[in-house]
Amino acid sequence: MKAVGVVVEYNPFHNGHLHHLTEARKQAKADVVIAVMSGYFLQRGEPAILPKWERTSLALQGGADLVVELPYAFSTQKAEWFATGAVSILAALEADALCFGSEEGTIEPFHRLYHFMAKHRLAWDRMIKEELDKGMSYPTATSLAFKRLEGSAEHLDLSRPNNILGFHYVKAIYDLHTSIKAMTIPRIKAGYHDDSLNESSIASATSIRKSLKTKEGWQMVDRVVPSYTTEMLKSFEKETTFLPSWERLFPLLKYRLLTATPEQLHAIYEGEEGLEYRALKTIVSATSFHDWMTKMKTKRYTWTRIQRYATHLFTNTTKEEIHSVLPRGTESLPYIRLLGMTSRGQMYLNGKKKQLTTPVITRPAKVDDRMMNLDLRAAFSYYASFPPSLQQKRLKEEFHRTPIRIDHKPEPKKEA
């Protein structure tokens, strides 16, 4: 059986994701789609709007055959480590291809850029340091340094978020010496960071999350997500009375900051360049998460960088812990956690069982590993603001729930 991989967050699952899954299967001529999905906290340093189990169910209904978890150590990271973790998992599962959405829309420019950057790596690193020394944020420094390289204007636009991630997927495929074939499809209509809905049936996850904050917005969201996503969001909000967000977690984050020392905050992953002192200085007067973020943000610290630091602070994840679990070179991962599958996905795993060298696990009780401990701590942190009875139920689920089984259902047509 031929397998294509996709790397996803589904925050939440929308029509653009449905298009991506359909096109990935078609372009790769694949029998099976493997979705590597972030768990409770995401790449931009924010809690997922739905727990991973609900998002796994949506992924399976949307066309994925296997859903496996991208561990916390990779999911809340810069693009390079995020991509490395995802590609490592797909390589371990012997995926034939990886299909990602990008603003570029064709794959050859990504390969050309990889070879160009390999040739100019030392010069690029030196120029990045020069830009950082001027007080630039890391993303700005990398972008400015890239533009300074002779010949860079002929290459891929790395100022676009999905092009950046796509480049790192391709880079990881080369660096890990895998046989995975990289493929890309153009992102349609909505940009990654677009924050408002329009008349299109395609919208960004950012605009959907923003719209879910109002009653009118809920009605508009129905147009840009499959019906099963709407049903899942309504069902979850009915059970909890809220959708997870940083604002919901802010009182706990504020307590964490106010009871920590600068030394403790410096030990937290991504706590560098005086970020810990700025966090302590600004938290006292902050009245909300957005207020605190506005006070924290400078030319040097991007919104995403601060959110990632906040996530690691909230989960009490240290530099030492992350550095101890990140793989070196082509070192294999300790395990792959299976969250859900269809009968076709199960057939694929059964066929590969004897040749896979990385264990595929279904419950954390079956493994004692530092990477898994970080995942469990992320779950404890995510559920910290839930009502006690629901929190107990969810945490028990985290240890004992077996993979979700769903076979694809056709999406019912909506009334015009």
From Swiss-Prot:
Protein's job:
Catalyzes the formation of N(4)-acetylcytidine (ac(4)C) at the wobble position of elongator tRNA(Met), using acetate and ATP as substrates. First activates an acetate ion to form acetyladenylate (Ac-AMP) and then transfers the acetyl group to tRNA to form ac(4)C34.
Q: What is this protein called?
A: tRNA(Met) cytidine acetate ligase
Q: Where is this gene product found?
A: Cytoplasm
Major location, coarse class? cytoplasm
List keywords of the entry alphabetically.
ATP-binding, Cytoplasm, Ligase, Nucleotide-binding, RNA-binding, tRNA processing, tRNA-binding
Reactions listed under catalytic activity: cytidine(34) in elongator tRNA(Met) + acetate + ATP = N(4)-acetylcytidine(34) in elongator tRNA(Met) + AMP + diphosphate
Q: What is its EC number?
A: 6.3.4.-
GO MF, one annotated term: ATP binding
Q: Which family does it belong to?
A: Belongs to the TmcAL family.
Specify the species.
Halalkalibacterium halodurans (strain ATCC BAA-125 / DSM 18197 / FERM 7344 / JCM 9153 / C-125)
Example of a GO cellular component annotation carried by this entry: cytoplasm
Q: Which SUPFAM superfamilies did the record assign?
A: Nucleotidylyl transferase
NCBIfam families attached to this UniProt entry = PRK13670.1
